[in-house]
Amino acid sequence: MAKKFYVIDTSVFLSDADCLYKFENNDIIIPIKVLEEVDKHKKRQDSVGFNARMIIKHLDSLREKGSLASGVRIDKGKGILQVVTATSELPRDLDPTIPDNEILASAIKIKEDNPKKKVIVVSRDINMRVIADSIGLTAQNYITEQVVDDRNKLYSGYA
């Protein structure tokens, strides 16, 4: 199967700090606007704040391997992670000052630069997925919930 580009939205990072390791051997694109949005949540004292801090730490450790702008291998057997800026024109009806639209502009640019590869916007934000689809981008939800079929595998709250 051909490698894909997954353009990751802020909502994914804020719900799962380990998401970078869940896209198999596909490449992950992080629009720089996502990093700005994640940074706004790092001081929160809840799971969103925790995930924001953890994803920043993950990215910092990857940064030590090489340039995030040029692309860094996430892990052995995993794809390349790259941080990009929005350099593409949005459709006229979309406000370029809205963060979600800046993220979509990054996805459009990746699609323009790689016409033979599948580019997928991954977001937990329903409206962002609807807009992405409306402007010709493939979009999918990020779902990490798993069903546990054995009660003994559930965390009891104590050791």
Predicted regions span which residues?
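Non-catalytic pre-domain segments flanking phosphatase-related domains
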Residues: 1-3
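Active-site-proximal, substrate-binding regions of enzyme catalytic domains
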Residues: 5-120, 126-159
